[in-house]
From Swiss-Prot:
Gene behind the chain: pfkA
Keyword Kinase listed: yes
Protein name from the UniProt record: ATP-dependent 6-phosphofructokinase
GO molecular function, one term: 6-phosphofructokinase activity
Organism: Bacillus cereus (strain ATCC 14579 / DSM 31 / CCUG 7414 / JCM 2152 / NBRC 15305 / NCIMB 9373 / NCTC 2599 / NRRL B-3711)
Subcellular location(s) per record: Cytoplasm
Length: 319
């Protein structure tokens, strides 16, 4: 293999730049040229493709976001549109593609593979919801951002003796809510994978109040429902002074943590190794702190699951 491409797609996540850097440097180490595809699959279709050198990725490892920019591209679901993308890759002499992103990005890589172009997926999303890996690039940084925010909110919740409902990202996956809630001692954690009883939430808050607790933190993944509605329900049912904070896109930004930088470097380099070995149609991951790779079609057929033991622990510790 003489030339490969790399793109980032979908929602950005801290550590994507570290992965790009690893792809470029690993490939050049093996005398392979690397071309960056800007704005994800949209840039692939339009031909926004440029050669990357060692200097192209200098000093990007501590930066959040993605040097290659990113975008969502719904038209890439069309086979004819994907053929245009493949034509652009062949036009530039690119023989393999590294795709950094989440579930939608993997779907695009899978479709390209099925149409005969070798791709390797690298899991980049703060949601930590990609099958075949224990952790995704950006999750640890987002988690620390959320924990820092909750710490600050708890300070003011304590001062004003208030209940706070804090909404975090996670439309379909509750990892951020679960890990952050457990790490911060939240009184209640609501995630889309687990049904909840609002009466039970209310009863839990009242029990805390009866034993003298003056404030509470409830962490809600966005996929559960409206945090504002949950906050209103709590205030009406308890008469507790209740506030709602939606953390939003701050969770996607910031300099990546050491863990995300190292993870991204390992996964990006491994993706290049797979392409060199002629193993397209794969996705890389980390399991039990060891690098792994899976057939991307098989990986996408799996469903991300929450850590049931951790969820149970969070309930037991928040009595």
């Amino acid at each position: 293999m003489k030339r490969i491409g790399v793109l980032t797609s979908g929602g950005d996540s801290p550590g994507m730049n570290a992965a790009i850097r690893a792809v470029v440097r690993k490939a050049i180490f093996h005398d392979i040229e690397v071309y960056g595809i800007y704005h994800g699959y949209a840039g692939l279709i339009s031909g926004h493709i440029e050669k990357l050198e060692l200097g192209s990725v200098g000093d990007i490892i501590p930066r959040g976001g993605t040097k290659l920019y990113t975008a969502r591209c719904l038209e890439f679901k069309d086979p004819e549109v994907r053929l245009k993308g493949i034509e652009q890759l062949k036009k530039h002499g690119i023989e393999g593609l590294v795709v950094i992103g989440g579930d939608g990005s993997y779907q695009g890589a899978k479709k390209l593979t099925e149409q005969g172009f070798p791709c390797v997926g690298v899991p980049g999303t703060i949601d930590n919801d990609i099958p075949g890996t224990d952790f995704t690039i950006g999750f640890d940084t987002a988690l620390n951002t959320v924990i820092d925010a909750i710490d600050k909110i708890r300070d003011t919740a304590t001062s004003h003796e208030r209940t706070y409902v804090i909404e975090v990202m996670g439309r379909h996956a509750g990892d951020i809510a679960l890990w952050a809630g457990l790490a911060d001692g939240a009184e209640t954690i609501l995630i889309p994978e687990e049904e909840y009883d609002m009466d039970d939430v209310i009863a839990r808050l009242k029990r805390g109040s009866e034993r003298g607790k003056k404030h509470s933190i409830i962490v809600v993944a966005e996929g559960v429902g409206s945090a504002i509605d949950i906050g209103k329900h709590i205030e009406e049912a308890t008469n507790f002074d209740t506030r709602v904070t939606v953390l939003g896109h701050v969770q996607r930004g910031g300099s990546p943590s050491a863990q995300d930088r190292v993870l991204a470097s390992r996964l990006g380099a491994r993706a290049v190794e797979l392409l060199i070995a002629g193993k397209g149609g794969r996705c890389v991951g980390i399991q039990d702190n060891k690098l792994v790779d899976h057939d991307i079609i098989e990986a996408l057929a799996q469903k991300h699951t929450i850590d049931k033991d951790m969820y149970q622990l969070s309930k037991e510790l928040s009595i």
